[in-house]
């Protein structure tokens, strides 16, 4: 879908102004119980009081979540006019704005409209600007229009006659802004499109079946990103991983015939003097649990155990598309976790790249094993900050459900930056404790530590395990087990936390 911006002069709204624009649909927002203003007022004047009459007669009151589609309206160039309720202006917050965007998108999806002049972004919530409104609009509209089978048609044979009676899909949206916002709006459209592209890549990688999206597939995806955006890429295979003494990572790979990959993708957007932000993504392309085998029911969803990897690849692609003035490195350890005659067994002791030994009490706590070696590896970059992203624990889902990602950080400053970015991007996280007292649960009689700490505070002890490998830099951990994908009728990857991560990086580059 193509997005562009157009500056409006409300003083020229009539026959020769923006309302004369030829388009399939004009989208206009109305507040509940307010006098008409802005575009709504201009539309009312051009249509000789039509909008005011609709409000007065009770046909459309501007209530939140409502819409009214009008056809062949005299005085405008659009084939349709869509009125969207914004609710009461005093209550118009981020969620109300998002609801208006989703309401308009659904309404347009029920028509044959292929283009729209979208006049909602001039009315951002308080504390937000037009750039925020544009980025939010683009990501939400693209999110609603995402279909894996359209992006990967090889996965399903089209039925006979497919497409003969299908409605035209929305292909072009022009986002109308005030003249004074034109420059900021243009940059925001580029950024919103980049974030949406990154989210779609992340969703694709998560949704693809594990016989397609293998560690090698992820490595080739990274190569493709590097080629398209002129990034530096390095892919390490098993022999190189062995040479680095990544014993924890290698322990997870033992049961699978799929070769492990260690991906390093580098975007140099700023001076070489700027220390990079490093994003580390867990890339378990299928997780059976290994010898500590998971129950069969729902195991198909373990293809989503690489969503951390998918999200850091989506994020660095978005950053490159934006041309952000920030150095960013994406690091992805990726493999399968499978049972076999040579797989790692409960009770085995391995030596990580850091030299610390680990008693593997549960082979289904494998994400932290591949991450700990990656977190040791990234010390060489002398990073400004490291953020690891992982579908790490079911315990995080029990704690936070499917609304907030779990956030752990030693530094209050880094935690606050990530939490603020999440709120702004409507991709929220909740900070959980990282107290040293929890470390006692990881004690082992046979190694420096165990890889699990028992049932209590399972997400916390997983983060505490990772913390032992991050003492040389500023670090945060995002547990996205509850937010990376949805189950049920709407099953599929969400693209989170790409919005949070990209907003965090945009804020740092500002």
UniProtKB/Swiss-Prot annotation:
InterPro entries: Leucine_aapep/pepB, Macro_dom-like, Peptidase_M17_C, Peptidase_M17_leu_NH2_pept, Peptidase_M17_N. Its main location: cytoplasm. Its cofactor is Mn(2+). Binds 2 manganese ions per subunit. The keyword RNA-binding does not apply. It is found in: Cytoplasm. Mn(2+) 1 binds at residues 287, 364, 366. Mn(2+) 2 binds at residues 282, 287, 305, 366. It is an enzyme of class 3 (hydrolase). It holds the Pfam family Peptidase_M17_N. It comes from the Bacteria. The active site is at residues 294, 368. Belongs to the peptidase M17 family. This is Probable cytosol aminopeptidase. It comes from Cupriavidus metallidurans (strain ATCC 43123 / DSM 2839 / NBRC 102507 / CH34). The lineage of its organism: Bacteria, Pseudomonadati, Pseudomonadota, Betaproteobacteria, Burkholderiales.
